[in-house]
Amino acid sequence: VSAGRIAEVIKRVESELAEFWSSPDESRPEPAPKTRASTMNFVAVGSRAEVERLKEQAEELAETHAGRTLLITLDDRLDPLSVQADWSATCRRAGEVPICYDRVELTFGVAAAERVASVVSALTISDVAVIVELAPGAPNVLGDALAPICDRLVFDSAETCIERIAEVARGTKAPLADRAFVRTFSFRELVARFFDDMPEASRAIRRVEIARSAGAKPDPAALLLGWMGSRLGWTFESRGPAQPGGAGVVGRARAADGAPIEIALVDGPPAGEQAQRRIDGVRLFTSLRGEPLALGCVRLDKAPATARWTMEGARSADHLHPLGYRDETWVLTKTIDSLEGDRLLREAVLAAAAWSAL
């Protein structure tokens, strides 16, 4: 572990890393140059309490996306102008050839945190992308400085409020990726499927009801509304307090043609104390060629990994669809690899923040 003034510590880390990579691999019968995996730079930013979890995450990610990992946090117990650094390297066999990758842990003093962007630029591998993930406890000063210099910004709107995410998003041109957006793909896909062969019904929506689990963490309804609103050209106009136990109107939007849309949010069973809140159901009230049409995509009470997909009125349908489950390593990998929804997510985040700010 090295600690001290920024320039001295970073110079020492760079020197030690260069020496490690330039020295031959002595684990083989005949010494040979080390083979370094350089698929990306992954920069994870969080609080001191999150460091161990971030380490575990980095190790799991390296199984498929080996490269250089930087774990960055802030510690007000350090000399304000200092930085503490530690690094390690791991080699694993891929056939006959050991593949090696490294990890650098950086803890900044309060004043030194302003230099985080230049430090990261100095320590990252220059010819591959810089992926920055802001963990829920990421200090604002670090996130604000790193967002403009990254090639991709990852966050989790199930843990971080949408207003903060939108604030950071406005400060970067980098593509955005959201763990929660990946987890809720199945719900969005099923909602969008209602309108595959009747797009005119999407323009006639006059009421939206969203059921979600109660809890202290960020409301997942905001991003779902942001996604729908940004796709359909809605303008959010008002938002009031939720109506306990019912589906009372808590907000209003204006459709692209100026027609009013009622928004109702329903509290479902509470999530656990530390659990993320989840979408439990979406109901849309619209019309098709002048006839009322009610659309529903709702989790089954006794099988919450399955949704019931229904149409009533102008059309009729009733199907069951699995929502699926993926572990968090898969979710993170998807945020890194899937590029097709970048613009869609940015627009959804900004619209969700506009709703939440009312």
Task: List the model feature ranges, each with a label.
Residues 102-106, 110-201:
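Conserved, well-structured core segments that form the ligand-binding/active-site neighborhood
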Residues 184-252:
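ATP/pyrophosphate-binding catalytic subdomain of soluble kinases
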Residues 1-133:
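An N-terminal, globular interaction/scaffold subdomain
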Residues 83-94, 151-160, 252-275:
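Acidic, Ser/Thr-rich peripheral helices and adjacent loops at domain boundaries
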Residues 54-55, 116-117, 142-144, 218-222:
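A short acidic (Asp/Glu
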Residues 49, 111, 179, 212-216, ...:
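Conserved aromatic-histidine-acidic binding/catalytic patches
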Residues 68-78, 132-136, 157-160, 235-251:
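A generic structural motif
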Residues 5, 9-32, 36, 40, ...:
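C-terminal structured domains
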